[in-house]
Amino acid sequence: MISKKKKRKKKSRYKRLDYVSIKANKTLKSRSGWEYAYFQYLDNDINVKSYEYESLKIPYLSNKKTGKIRTYIPDFFVTFVDDSKLIVEIKPKRFLEKLQIKKKINAAKEYAQKNGIQFIVLTEDGLKLLNLI
């Protein structure tokens, strides 16, 4: 008799939280409580005209030896009422020293500079300053 192995359900790495956004005009699924709090912050900021969540795609060189190109998707792309733009990545400080994260951040900085856009990484320190955590 052949035994069948039960497939385990793959658990998500993130607790996805639904958020109904006024300015994005749709329901968004955050990957963390920090992102959820930032949704609320953006919706309540009168200087924010609109924002998109995980919509921007930035190519970056993942491996110099193989030439492997990957795609980095920052958390937020914000447009302000004065039409200035901002790319935001929300990341715990402890992850900022990881090589892949550094590559993604450098790619976002280059992209932002070439396109006249600001780029910031919001860690727990920045979120505390905004009273979001």
Residue ranges of each PLM-predicted region?
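Electrostatic, structured charged patches in enzyme active sites and in nucleic-acid/phosphate-binding
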Residues: M1-I133
